Amino acid sequence: YSAASNKKDTRVFRFYCELKEEVNPDVLQEALNQTIEIFPTFLMVLRKGLFWHYLEPCNLRPIVKEEYKDPCSRLYMKDKKTLLFEVTYYKKRINFEVFHVLTDGTGATEFLKELVKNYLYLIHKVNGLEPVSLLPEDMTVQDQEVDSFLKYYSKDQKRPKKRKLHAFQIRKRKKDGNHLHVHESVASVQAVLKRSRELG
């Protein structure tokens, strides 16, 4: 991923959670500090070796910031020691952006769930909210480091052929520059489930 990332394709993806109230940045920072204790494998920098890139543990600490740049902007800067993820906020939204070399969608989902859980507990514990665990009690750092692709993927495994359905393509004239265009939609879960069941 690192060798292929550039201004046009940063290999960064974003997950976010929209709350019902404005985000308190100080509490979010405290929640992030707690979350990183559970996910220490996220405290990595990408280094360039003689033949390949590698991840190296670091002492950098993530700092919560108000959203200040375009979504999915570059996180990996060649020859610069920076974390490969970022937590920002905007009004009621908590954003988690991560360079794909660090984790996949599942890891990002677990990190964001833990972050939001910690945030909500810190904000609402005065109202009697009890702490809950979202992760298995016996999960270790080694469990977090497992590369599921290597564990489960096999090029020899036969897969049944399926008819390929093409996703809807938004057709528009390309604009100049390296700007990411964000499309956001809101849909009823019931309506989407009903339609997906109709289509099989």
Please tell me what each predicted stretch does.
Residues Y1-D147, V189, L193-R195:
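Non-catalytic N-terminal regions of enzymes
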Residues F149-L199:
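Flexible, P/S/T/G-rich "lid" or insertion loops adjacent to the active sites of thioester-utilizing
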